Amino acid sequence: MEAAVRRECLAVRNTAGIFDASTLGKIEVVGPDAATFMNRMYVNAWTKLGVGRCRYGLLCRENGFVYDDGVVGRIAEDRFHVTTTTGGAAGVLSMMEDYLQTEWPDLDVWLTSTTEQWSVIALQGPKAREILAPLVDGLDISGEVLPHMSVVEGTILGVPMRLFRVSFSGELGFEINVPTTEGRRIWEAVWQAGQAHGLTPYGTETMHVLRAEKGYIIVGQETDGTVTPDDAGCGWAVGKAKKDFVGKRSLALPALQSPERMQLVGLLTDAPQEVLEEGAQLVADPKEAIPMRKLGYVTSSYFSATLGRSIALGMISGGRARKGQTLYVPMEDRVIPVKLVDPVFYDAEGVRLND
């Protein structure tokens, strides 16, 4: 499997890859007060998001800890297409309904699960636009008309479509949403169109590596129910000027603002071929008597074919201030030195996904 993952990763980085993202949760938030509702639910600001634009949405519980995330597209002034994590779809909808019915019954909003109504085909890589352009019906998908984090409605081979210009790989990317009944036909059409461009199907393991190279978190892997947006490196997403949102008061607590909290960092081993074990603990002094003081742990660890070496993400106490330091992973038969670095290993400026 390792050889397949490396092959698929390089294909996405160099040509194009196709991935079935249909399992992602989808919720339609509709009504005159849809933007107000989103503004109260998510940590982000939504009222000024333009129609046809997308935003990375981060949802917290009342305690201020990250509960779910996903890209949200504004389809119309009164309609949002919300994506959730695969496992979080039912919980997010339940949470939304709970707040709508008990806290804000005055809001004129309807919520509908559309997870099973849409098939989602992710087309990622530098050749993605060349493959997709001949298939969409009279739609300009150039970077000038459809920039990164945009959404447009149209048709693909006569089939109704919501096309998102988004990327979880760090490359130029599109997510083609079509009715589930047409999903296989459109997949096969995209697949055939991509043969001349080296299109390669890729799976979940490859997706995990690609997103880790970009430092993108996965809820439930980088988060464990005790992680705030800032801990996860997503403090930029929090709407600082918003009067209120779920979790706002908790995020203001001193305990949740401590500089010693576990924070997301990148991890590099001295030996580029050594892949850390996920869950491995990191300490400052491997010679300290047991029980050693744990400073953090590895959340994600992979070999990056793109970079030609191993990479890892971890949550470390005061991690951002420790960048450049060396910590240690005590193993049964050896001690592994690990350098703390920025969690974005690939294209930190975002040039490729904005192509």
Language-model segments: which ranges?
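Acidic, proline/glycine-enriched N-terminal capping motif
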Residues: 1-57, 65
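Membrane-targeting and insertion segments and their boundary/processing signals
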Residues: 8-12, 63-66, 70, 102, ...
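Acidic active-site catalytic centers that drive phospho-/nucleotidyl reactions
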Residues: 20, 69, 175
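Residue-level detector of beta-strand structural context in well-folded domains
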Residues: 25, 57, 70-71, 152, ...
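Well-ordered mid-protein domain cores that form the structural environment of catalytic cofactors
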Residues: 45-78, 83-99
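Conserved, structured C-terminal
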Residues: 76-355
